[in-house]
Amino acid sequence: MGGRSSCEDPGCPRGEGRVPRMGCVKSRFLREGSKASKIEPNANQKGPVYVPDPTSPKKLGPNSINSLPPGVVEGSEDTIVVALYDYEAIHREDLSFQKGDQMVVLEESGEWWKARSLATKKEGYIPSNYVARVNSLETEEWFFKGISRKDAERHLLAPGNMLGSFMIRDSETTKGSYSLSVRDFDPQHGDTVKHYKIRTLDSGGFYISPRSTFSSLQELVVHYKKGKDGLCQKLSVPCVSPKPQKPWEKDAWEIPRESLQMEKKLGAGQFGEVWMATYNKHTKVAVKTMKPGSMSVEAFLAEANLMKTLQHDKLVKLHAVVSQEPIFIVTEFMAKGSLLDFLKSEEGSKQPLPKLIDFSAQISEGMAFIEQRNYIHRDLRAANILVSASLVCKIADFGLARIIEDNEYTAREGAKFPIKWTAPEAINFGSFTIKSDVWSFGILLMEIVTYGRIPYPGMSNPEVIRALEHGYRMPRPDNCPEELYSIMIRCWKNRPEERPTFEYIQSVLDDFYTATESQYQQQP
């Protein structure tokens, strides 16, 4: 819960996501039971018929004994939450609230919880990521739950923060412990972030340095706001935390076409178009329209149910589908479009190398998640990465590559087959695995470091295939560090099993500039 770090854009009404072509596949997925079943419409109810979201837990009735966790009594401190942000109701059953309002949780299920306002006694659904339990750390502006060290750095270095901006977060390595992250400046590296382990006393207190101990984290913050006492900076203000994206509407999975108002065509791909649209007059989304006949509706629905379960900060969120032809795929809206277009734009072409490495690290984090879940992307390239207004990169188009029914795309001779991104064993034998994704990631790194240049410039597809068979690999561009190029070369090993894992690639890219020094400051 809490987790105020999930959205990256202050101006984003409900997420951002512009989708090109899709592509993540569970290697061995048993399709039984994967089709959503339609719900009988209520005869008196005006409005769309919704099909349950395949990822949401079974609904509990408002009076269900299991609505709350075991041992939790309604109205006890455990069930009272406080609003971290204002929320204006947009669905019929929602409850509006102001930052600071307190509510009793009646039912916890999925991303929308049923609650009653203590002030107005009104009941309705609330977005669970907008509230925190009273007296919990999450009510503190400076506490960021479940955020990684790398994302803490991204947040603190973002515009709107200053010297001494800080956050306390859960430790990634030690369960139940915390870390303090502080924005600093040093002449050699410029703006930077320093991390301090917060250690725990046997008596339950906290300290960074044994000479200054505190009974609570709140006390620790007050102390280091007065003076730096050995830290790199005196703590100034909590890290800026924009409102998170509101969760997608409850149970709106297969939606009626009429609920989408198409507004602006963002692009056209091989299999359809991408539009900016508004869902039910209140939520900005991206809609990918698929040309009729490009895939079977049954195969698509089975794959979409699967893609919906892949939820990660660095993957574009799949919100809903229109399941009759022409198929519509509804995702979060991403303000800056594809990474390929962004890198070629005026803003993108000015991004310094450390930012390019950060883009690469974000993509490898998303791919490490896909790897961990035993999925495959099959079409990893800069055109299928989307960029948010605050330059967060998210992977799109996972899942669709496998179900496209177009020989131009599926056969290696086809005009649409992405030869230059595809591993030799996938070209020659149709063998797509996470290791062929690793090969594609090496090509994607080259796209990033050359600001969107087409791989193997000047070479035709047949020439590329022949060159690869003779051991040719793209040379290192002048602006590309040796360490980055060596990752590419490892991604392009002939034998798939010799290519690194995405988990390993992420660990190298996350610490690309700091691998030689300790991530955490020594005790002050």
From Swiss-Prot:
Residues 1-20, 35-71 are annotated as: Disordered. It is an enzyme of class 2 (transferase). CDD domains: SH2_Src_HCK. It is found in: Cytoplasmic vesicle, Secretory vesicle; Cytoplasm, Cytosol. It catalyses: L-tyrosyl-[protein] + ATP = O-phospho-L-tyrosyl-[protein] + ADP + H(+). One of its GO terms (cellular component) is transport vesicle. The modification Phosphoserine is found at residue 460. Interacts with ADAM15. Interacts with FASLG. Interacts with ARRB1 and ARRB2. Interacts with FCGR1A; the interaction may be indirect. Interacts with IL6ST. Interacts (via SH3 domain) with ELMO1. Interacts (via SH3 domain) with TP73. Interacts with YAP1. Interacts with ABL1 and ITGB1, and thereby recruits ABL1 to activated ITGB1. Interacts (via SH2 domain) with FLT3 (tyrosine phosphorylated). Interacts with CBL. Interacts with VAV1, WAS and RAPGEF1. Interacts (via SH3 domain) with WDCP. This is Tyrosine-protein kinase HCK. It comes from Rattus norvegicus (Rat). The gene is Hck.
